[in-house]
C-alpha cells in the first residue's frame, strides 16, 4: 500500500512540475493577453513581475486587470488590459512609473504614444455601418492618434425600399493603430463590441505580428 502511495505521489510530482513551467512565452501568445505599454518580452516580463498590483491600482480607467490563466500558471495575477472595462489612456505612463522591478519600463509620454500594445480588428458582422447600413463614427471620433488610425471607406448601398444611400464604413490602419482599446470601450454594440483589440502587432514581440501583405 505504501509503495502504491509513493508511486502516485512521485508521478503526480513529475506531471505537476512541467505544468508549472508552461507559459505563453513557450507557445502562441493568446489574443486577449494585452500587456501594459512598456512591458518587456513575455518571458522576461513574467520573470520580473512580482504581481504586486501597483500598476492596476494607478490605472486611470481601471482597464488593467489581473490575469487568471490567460498567461499560464506563471502569469496568474499579472496585469493585462481588458478594453471592455477600460482603455489605455493615450498620454498616461503611470503603470511604468510605479512598477518596482522594471517588468514595465518607465516611458516618457513621447515614447509611450509610439508603443503598440495590440491592434484593433473590425467584426463586419456586428459593425453597424457594415451589417445594418446604419451611420456610426464612434470609433473614429475617439481614436487618439494624431493621424487617425481609423478612417472611412464611403460605400453606396441599397436600402429596403429600393433606394440608394451612402454609408461610411470604418477601416483600421495597422501602421497607426497602437491598440489602446478606446474604440472597443466606446463601441455602442455593447454585448460584444464590433471592434475589438488583440495583442497582435505589439511592439515588444517580434513573433506576435499580423501578416500584412
Positions of PLM-derived features:
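Non-ligating segments of multi-cofactor redox enzymes
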Residues: 1-213
Amino acid at each position: 500500500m505504501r509503495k502504491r502511495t509513493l508511486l502516485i505521489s512521485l508521478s503526480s510530482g513529475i506531471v505537476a512540475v512541467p505544468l508549472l513551467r508552461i507559459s505563453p512565452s513557450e507557445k502562441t501568445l493568446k489574443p486577449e493577453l494585452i500587456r501594459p505599454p512598456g512591458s518587456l518580452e513575455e518571458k522576461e516580463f513574467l520573470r520580473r513581475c512580482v504581481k504586486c498590483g501597483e500598476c492596476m491600482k494607478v490605472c486611470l480607467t481601471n482597464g488593467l486587470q489581473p490575469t487568471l490563466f490567460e498567461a499560464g500558471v506563471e502569469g496568474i495575477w499579472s496585469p493585462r488590459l481588458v478594453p471592455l472595462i477600460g482603455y489605455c489612456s493615450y498620454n498616461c505612463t503611470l503603470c511604468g512609473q510605479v512598477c518596482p522591478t522594471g517588468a514595465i519600463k518607465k516611458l516618457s509620454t513621447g515614447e509611450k504614444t509610439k508603443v503598440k500594445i495590440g491592434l484593433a480588428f473590425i467584426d463586419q458582422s456586428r459593425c453597424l455601418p457594415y451589417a445594418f447600413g446604419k451611420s456610426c463614427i464612434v470609433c473614429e471620433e475617439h481614436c487618439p492618434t494624431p493621424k487617425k488610425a481609423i478612417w472611412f471607406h464611403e460605400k453606396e448601398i441599397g436600402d429596403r425600399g429600393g433606394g440608394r444611400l451612402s454609408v461610411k464604413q470604418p477601416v483600421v490602419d495597422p501602421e497607426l493603430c497602437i491598440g489602446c482599446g478606446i474604440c472597443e470601450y466606446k463601441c455602442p454594440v455593447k454585448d460584444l463590441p464590433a471592434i475589438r483589440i488583440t495583442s497582435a502587432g505589439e511592439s515588444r514581440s517580434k513573433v506576435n505580428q499580423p501578416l500584412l501583405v
